[in-house]
């Protein structure tokens, strides 16, 4: 979906929607293009990772263990376009066991989630993801 792009918050909305469209296609390169070199990635209930290379490794880990699609994406932005938030519903399949988590057996799950973004000059500088890990674990046990 294209927005007129004349206002900062419209451009920020477009960046976030492009990011999630690339995610849903499994197009990791298109996701990486939208990130600043020093992107900060706050993993849900986990560590903070910094840099595009770290984000690429995260995507490789995700691809190995999960197949996910995000539905019902809603994006909200600040008037200056420097911050954005997204809410969505994750529809996924747990393909291969992720260390420290229950054993994967091809379980399906549906889980609400959200993210916060910092965006400058059309690039994502920070993405912080949230979902209810206990809910996810209960669904895949």
Give the label of every model feature segment:
Residues 1-141:
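C-terminal and inter-domain tail/linker signature
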């Amino acid at each position: 979906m294209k927005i007129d792009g004349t206002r900062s918050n419209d451009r920020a909305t477009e960046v976030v929607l492009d990011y999630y469209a690339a995610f849903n296609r499994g197009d990791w390169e298109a996701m990486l293009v939208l990130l600043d070199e020093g992107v900060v990635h706050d993993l849900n209930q986990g560590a903070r990772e910094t840099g595009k290379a770290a984000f690429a490794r995260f995507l490789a880990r995700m691809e190995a263990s999960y197949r996910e699609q995000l539905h019902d994406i809603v994006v909200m932005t600040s008037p200056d376009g420097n911050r954005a938030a997204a809410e969505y519903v994750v529809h996924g399949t747990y393909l291969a066991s992720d260390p420290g988590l229950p054993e994967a057996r091809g379980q399906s799950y549906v889980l609400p989630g959200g993210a916060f973004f910092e965006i400058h000059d059309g690039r994502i500088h920070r993405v912080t993801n949230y979902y209810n890990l206990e809910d996810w674990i209960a669904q895949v046990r």
